[in-house]
C-alpha cells in the first residue's frame, strides 16, 4: 500500500481560470526527475487521489505540481480551492519510468508535451544532470491558447542557462500567437514545419523523441514516425 504523508500548501499560482500550480512542503522520499506521485484529499469520508508529476527539480524542497481543473471532477476543483496553510495528502514514494535513465544516447533529444504534461521535462531540465550525452535538446510545449503556456518564462530561462544546447518552441492550436507555431504537433512534424522552426532534423538516426501529454498526440506522433 502507498505510504501517505501530510503536506502543507505554501503557494497557489492561478495561471488561468482552469490552470494552476500547487507548491507543497511534505516529507517525501527522494525522487527522480520525470517521476510522479499522488495527491489526495478526504472528501465525503474517503480519500480521493490522482497522480501528478513533479515540476520541481528533485533537489528543490518546494514540491510543485501543474494542474488543470476538471469542472465536474471530484478532486481537481478541491485542489484548486486550497490556500497556503491548507493540508493535502501526498504519497511519499514517487513512481514512473519517464526518466532519463530510459533514454538512449543520441545527438538530439526531442521533448514534446501538451498541456500540463510539460512538468516532467521542467523537472529534468531544472536538475540538469545526465544531459551531457545529448548534443542538442528541444523542448516543445503545445497548448490551445498562448495564455495556457504557463511556464514559458521558465522555459526561456532554461534556454538561456543551456547556452544554445536547448531550443524551445511553443505551439498553439486555437489562435495565432507571436513566437508560437499554429496547429498540432503531429501535423507540424509531418509537414516539416516544426523541424524548420527549430533548425534541427528529427530522424531515427540522430534523434530520440520523448512524448508526454494528450494520448491522441502520442498516437498521432507515433504514426507519423
Question: For each predicted feature, which ranges?
Answer:
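Ferredoxin-reductase
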Residues: 2-86
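Reductase modules of NAD(P)H-dependent flavoproteins
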Residues: 2-5, 140, 145-225
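Short, conserved phosphate/pyrophosphate- and ester-handling motifs at nucleotide-, phospho-/glycolipid
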Residues: 34, 117, 214
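Short, charged beta-turn/beta-strand-edge "cap" motif at the junction between a beta-strand
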Residues: 42-46, 92-97
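Short, compositionally biased
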Residues: 51-61, 100-112
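Conserved S-adenosyl-L-methionine
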Residues: 106, 130-137
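Ser/Thr-glycine-rich phosphate-binding loops at phosphate-binding pockets of nucleotides
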Residues: 114-120
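Histidine-anchored nucleotide/phosphate-binding helix
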Residues: 120-130
Amino acid at each position: 500500500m502507498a505510504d501517505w504523508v501530510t503536506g502543507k500548501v505554501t503557494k497557489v499560482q492561478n495561471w488561468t481560470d482552469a490552470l494552476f500550480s500547487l507548491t507543497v512542503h511534505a516529507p517525501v522520499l527522494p525522487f527522480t526527475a520525470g517521476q510522479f506521485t499522488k495527491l489526495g484529499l478526504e472528501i465525503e469520508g474517503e480519500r480521493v487521489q490522482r497522480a501528478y508529476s513533479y515540476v520541481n527539480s528533485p533537489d528543490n524542497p518546494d514540491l510543485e505540481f501543474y494542474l488543470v481543473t476538471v469542472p465536474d471532477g471530484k478532486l481537481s476543483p478541491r485542489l484548486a480551492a486550497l490556500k497556503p496553510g491548507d493540508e493535502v495528502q501526498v504519497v511519499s514514494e514517487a513512481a514512473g519510468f519517464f526518466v532519463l535513465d530510459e533514454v538512449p544516447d543520441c545527438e538530439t533529444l526531442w521533448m514534446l508535451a501538451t498541456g500540463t504534461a510539460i512538468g516532467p521535462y521542467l523537472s529534468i531540465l531544472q536538475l540538469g544532470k545526465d544531459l551531457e550525452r545529448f548534443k542538442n535538446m528541444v523542448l516543445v510545449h503545445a497548448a490551445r491558447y498562448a495564455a495556457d503556456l504557463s511556464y514559458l518564462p521558465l522555459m526561456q530561462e532554461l534556454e538561456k542557462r543551456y547556452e544554445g544546447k536547448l531550443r524551445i518552441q511553443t505551439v498553439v492550436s486555437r489562435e495565432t500567437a507571436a513566437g508560437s507555431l499554429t496547429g498540432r504537433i503531429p501535423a507540424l512534424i509531418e509537414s516539416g514545419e516544426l523541424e524548420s522552426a527549430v533548425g534541427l532534423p528529427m530522424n531515427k538516426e540522430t534523434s530520440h523523441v520523448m512524448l508526454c501529454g494528450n494520448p491522441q498526440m502520442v498516437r498521432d506522433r507515433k504514426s507519423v514516425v
